[in-house]
Amino acid sequence: MEIKKSLENKFNTSLANLTGSPIREFDRYASSIEGIIKLTLGEPDFPTPKNIQDAAISAIKDGRASFYTVTSGLPESKEAIVAYFAKYYGYTIKPNQVTIATGAKFSLYTFFMSVINPGDEAIIPTPCWVSYGDQIKMAEGIPVFVQATEANHFKVTVEQLEAARTEKTKVLVLNSPSNPTGMIYTAKELLAIGNWAVEHDILILADDIYGRLVYNGNEFTPISSLSEAIRKQTIVINGVSKSYSMTGWRLGYAVGDPEIIAAMSKIAGQTTSNPTTATQYAAIEALTGPQDTVEIMRQAFEERLNTIYPLLSEVPGFDVVKPQGAFYLFPN
């Protein structure tokens, strides 16, 4: 970000280190072209399922949505996440291990602001989502990018992580299924990475936002489900945006060590106060209500993948690794 000379003393100088979102910039450019089909922002193109809409409307009409909630979220919202983890993650969590936020992106922000001290390093496998690095910089940390290769299906190895580790390494960011590659780490790969993190006392930031969107028989394994030791090192970030087509509603959550969760809630309390109340009631319905619409959308994404992948692979000069999850194609 370039700061004009006449205004430079009016801005926080750390802004100069932030790049902004190139995806948003590209989206603005694409929006200016008449008749273009935009495949820019990472969101489903389905409307939010009606039962979820109705839950929010009901909360608005009967007055429940009119007021603040606890900063970390309604007790009912936390219980919905507890039940969701028991069903989809296979282990039991307590409400004090949950904090709900205004989107998974804000959950990530409060995590980095809670654990990163000036000079701490966070390892980020690339290709990656653009916001991890800038959020770490905002916490005065140092993002350390480790390049995953196309030959290894865009997945990093323990050997690569160890080569990047220093005495300042504090966090490993792990996004599986991946944005933008769509690749999924196997349970064996995750166990090796998790044990490495435990051995070196490195926190794992597990961005699981695409965990329900997997295709063609592939399976998502949460790294936090593999052992108690790995679970203690892991903060899981998830939300309702991708699986339930709720990107505009803005609700994400974090699950993990109660002390880290409490610190994240403290930051949220001084910034957003609480996640939007009506959205929380919508999210409760999303997480605990019928899941058939999730499967309908997943099948639609799978059909699109299986249609476009072979066509794109035929384009001269394009090399594409077939995604296993999320909803992106990442051609070379």
Question: PLM ranges: what are they?
Answer:
Residues 2-7, 11-103, 110, 286-289:
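N-terminal small-domain helix-loop-helix segment of the aminotransferase-like
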Residues 33, 139, 199-200, 230:
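Helix C-cap/helix->beta junction micro-motif
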Residues 114-136:
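Conserved PLP-anchoring active-site segment centered on the Schiff-base-forming lysine
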Residues 149-218:
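Active-site phosphate-binding strand-loop segment of PLP-dependent enzymes
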Residues 226-263, 278:
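Active-site PLP attachment segment
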Residues 258, 275-291, 296-297:
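Structural motif of enzymes handling amino- and sulfur-group chemistry
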Residues 264-268, 287-310:
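Structural signature of PLP-dependent enzymes
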Residues 284, 299-309, 320-332:
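Conserved glycine-rich beta-strand-loop-beta hairpin in the small C-terminal domain of fold type I
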